[in-house]
Amino acid sequence: MTDDVSRETPSVPDVARRVFASDRLSLAERFVELLAGDGVVRGLIGPRETPRLWDRHLLNCALLAQQVPLEATVADLGSGAGLPGVVLAIARPDLRVTLVEPLLRRTTFLEEVVAELGLDRVEVLRARAEALHGDRRFAVVTSRALAPLDRLLGWSMPLVEPTGALLAMKGSAVAEEITAAGPELARWGCATPEVLSLGADLGLAPTVAVRVVWADPGRVSWPIAAPRKRGGQQRRAGHARGTSNRRRGT
């Protein structure tokens, strides 16, 4: 990974010192530098986003950390540039985070970031979410602007433990997404989603997320079969065929 850092790399805002612990803030700073440098060069972050890396990307992703249980296992689907997965690993060193991303150029960047930051509890997995169905389960499955909720359920819920949760970062249309996902929520046996608004206590623009859990955890078993659609065929979750690359720092 190069040391070429954009001149537009934003300075650390005061609120970041309230979001990240003192011994983790330097890692967050370095991640911002990597996003502003190689992240922009490789097309993972738009150049116009560079001045907003802290407030629009790192801080709002870090707010999600307060919703994750202690020492939880986390799968971040469609991790892309590591948002929110890498940020969660920085903010919460107690977590075990798996970054799930199908594109090689993105997983290469993620592997380099993980090594650079010494995040030894982070796994980079080049795969689609469906490739993990039937083989892996997590306490929390996260995503950020990956897909509408109705489609996201089919990728995420087969990975969620009986007492776990899907935790998806969403935008202002979250209520409409929940309404549209009503039939899928019922088919998968999910409880009514909970909408979270985070960051107001820090004076930040609200970060919106939706939490989805199983309606009856006691009835969840594996491998989870995709619920039958009317007039369709039932599909059973397959076994993982992704490539795992665990990178450890020095």
UniProtKB/Swiss-Prot annotation:
Keywords: Cytoplasm, Methyltransferase, rRNA processing, S-adenosyl-L-methionine, Transferase. It comes from Nocardioides sp. (strain ATCC BAA-499 / JS614). This is Ribosomal RNA small subunit methyltransferase G. InterPro entries: rRNA_ssu_MeTfrase_G, SAM-dependent_MTases_sf. GO terms for cellular component: cytosol. Coiled coil: none annotated. Pfam families: GidB (PF02527). Its EC number is 2.1.1.-. Belongs to the methyltransferase superfamily. RNA methyltransferase RsmG family. It is found in: Cytoplasm. Residues 224-250 are annotated as: Disordered. HAMAP family: 16SrRNA_methyltr_G. It comes from the Bacteria. Residues 227-250 have a biased composition (Basic residues). Specifically methylates the N7 position of guanine in position 518 of 16S rRNA. One of its GO terms (molecular function) is rRNA (guanine-N7-)-methyltransferase activity. S-adenosyl-L-methionine binds at G78, L83, A129, E130, R144.
